[in-house]
């Protein structure tokens, strides 16, 4: 097989998509134009040797996890039969029993063993284990040993962590946040709905703010802030149409905007001004990523068999979107590029201003 010819053919549809994006951008009333340029497309089966010092970006596509480099080398692709978790630092594949789990560094060397029963979850350089029964979780250290744990009487329905804290939402409508050492920092129940389940939660990078989608039948979106030993609600609004599944909530890096997936829309709240905006997006939002300069927001959503990437400028203004069909997908940002995974292929698109 002529791989170079195949690679060129794969870039053609992506180039067409971004030519359309260029036309859309060029009619925007902006002082600059943002250009998207296709760089490469690789199949995850094309494994190449790579220096350990090179940046490795994690991916998950269907039943495959692994790492690739910004210059287009697929470093590893591991097929897992049941469940897996991956971050820039570690990866692990595990079965249904979940009695103990070996986990590995990105280069494939053993990092440690998690002896806690349950399903491990890696979030950047943080390790958690969701324990059997669904009401308890464990925070582990970098070797997989238990640092602290917490058990509630009601099942965990939403979870989030950041550098400075962890937040969990529960089926009884309670939201609890924890300091990095496991001490409870905030605990409150938003209420206001006929069914008070927490369907989505996020904690800000500094650990001071928590946002959640709360309840059904008079569903609300709420942002709370630490105020002494209490939690102060700094924003709330009722949602006209309730969502009935777990949903994504995410702060931007500076915690001045928070995003959430409502029923066929993306909700955006400016936490400094206590203002909100809704952008129509059908289906389920699976990822929200930010460019390194924080000027662009990329939103990946899926409606039936169609994926859509929606691009926002200045945190709230829709600029463009494009769609494609696929069985699985992901997006990642790094420096001045966005990486898009689709089925068994990964593509790099560079971003520039001219």
Give the predicted meaning of each segment:
Residues 14, 19-20, 172, 195, ...:
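Terminal alpha-helical anchor/extension segments at protein ends
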Residues 33-44, 71-80, 105-115, 143-151, ...:
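A short beta-strand motif characteristic of beta-propeller blades
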Residues 39, 100-101, 138-140, 149, ...:
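N-terminal start-of-chain detector that recognizes signal peptides
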Residues 43-54, 78-90, 113-126, 151-163, ...:
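Repeated scaffold domains used in trafficking and secretory/extracellular systems
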Residues 48-68, 83-97, 101-104, 119-132, ...:
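Short beta-strand elements that form the blades of beta-propeller/WD-repeat-like
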Residues 130, 139-213:
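Glycine- and small hydrophobic-enriched segments that form the cores of compact globular domains
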Residues 195-197, 201-354:
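Extracytoplasmic/luminal low-complexity segments enriched in Pro/Gly and acidic/polar residues
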């Amino acid at each position: 097989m002529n791989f170079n010819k195949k690679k060129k053919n794969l870039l053609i549809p992506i180039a067409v998509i971004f030519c359309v994006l260029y036309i859309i951008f060029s009619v925007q009333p902006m002082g600059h134009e943002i250009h998207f340029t296709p760089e490469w497309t690789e199949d995850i089966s094309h494994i190449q040797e790579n220096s350990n010092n090179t940046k490795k970006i994690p991916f998950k596509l269907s039943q495959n996890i692994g790492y690739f480099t910004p210059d287009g080398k697929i470093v590893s692709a591991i097929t897992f039969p049941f469940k897996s978790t991956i971050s820039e630092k570690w990866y692990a594949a595990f079965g249904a029993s979940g009695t103990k789990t070996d986990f590995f560094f990105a280069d494939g060397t053993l990092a440690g063993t998690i002896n806690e029963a349950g399903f491990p979850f890696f979030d950047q350089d943080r390790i958690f284990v969701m324990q059997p029964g669904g009401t308890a979780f464990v925070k582990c250290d970098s070797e997989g040993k238990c640092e602290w744990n917490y058990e509630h009487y009601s099942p965990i329905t939403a979870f989030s962590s950041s550098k400075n804290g962890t937040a969990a939402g529960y089926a009884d409508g309670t939201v609890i946040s924890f300091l990095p050492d496991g001490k409870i920092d905030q605990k409150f129940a938003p209420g206001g709905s006929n069914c008070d389940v927490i369907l989505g939660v996020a904690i800000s990078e500094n650990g001071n703010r928590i946002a959640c989608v709360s309840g059904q039948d008079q569903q609300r979106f709420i942002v709370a802030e630490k105020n002494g030993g209490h939690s102060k609600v700094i924003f709330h609004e009722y949602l006209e149409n309730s969502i009935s599944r777990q949903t994504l909530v995410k702060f931007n890096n500076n915690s001045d905007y928070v995003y959430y997936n409502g029923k066929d829309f993306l909700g955006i709240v400016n936490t400094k001004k206590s203002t909100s905006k809704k952008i129509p997006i059908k289906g389920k939002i699976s990822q929200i990523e930010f460019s390194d300069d924080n000027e662009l927001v990329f939103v990946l959503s899926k409606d039936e068999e169609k994926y859509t990437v929606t691009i926002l400028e200045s945190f709230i203004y829709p600029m463009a979107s494009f769609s494609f069909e696929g069985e699985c997908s992901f997006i990642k940002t790094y420096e001045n590029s966005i990486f898009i995974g689709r089925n068994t292929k990964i593509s790099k698109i560079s971003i520039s201003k001219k």
